[in-house]
Amino acid sequence: MVKLRLKRYGRKQQNTYRIVAIDAQSRREGRALEEVGFYNLRKDQTQLDILAIVNLIREGAQPTETVYDILRKAGIFERIKANP
């Protein structure tokens, strides 16, 4: 199963995350199948590849709780419901 989850980058105390599609059994820093976004918690910046995320979710990818919240705030799930 493919999951959408956060992959940690950055220095100590200055975390940034990439939102990646990765096999559910891979470790957090494992090889990603696809990079679909960026999330900087400190500056509250988010950059998403919306088309790639929508396609992955339609194919069955499951977001983690944190990624789900990020996608919900960006309105991804409304787009999926609007265009089935």
Swiss-Prot record:
Transmembrane feature ranges: none
Keyword Ribosomal protein appears in the UniProt entry: yes
Pfam families assigned: Ribosomal_S16
Example of a GO MF term: structural constituent of ribosome
A Gene Ontology biological process term: mitochondrial translation
Cell location: Plastid, Chloroplast
Keyword annotations of the record: Chloroplast, Plastid, Ribonucleoprotein, Ribosomal protein
PROSITE patterns (alphabetical): RIBOSOMAL_S16
Gene Ontology annotations for the cellular component aspect, listed alphabetically: chloroplast; mitochondrion; small ribosomal subunit
InterPro entries recorded: Ribosomal_bS16, Ribosomal_bS16_CS, Ribosomal_bS16_dom_sf
Stored PANTHER family: 30S RIBOSOMAL PROTEIN S16, SMALL RIBOSOMAL SUBUNIT PROTEIN BS16M
Homology family: Belongs to the bacterial ribosomal protein bS16 family.
Protein name: Small ribosomal subunit protein bS16c
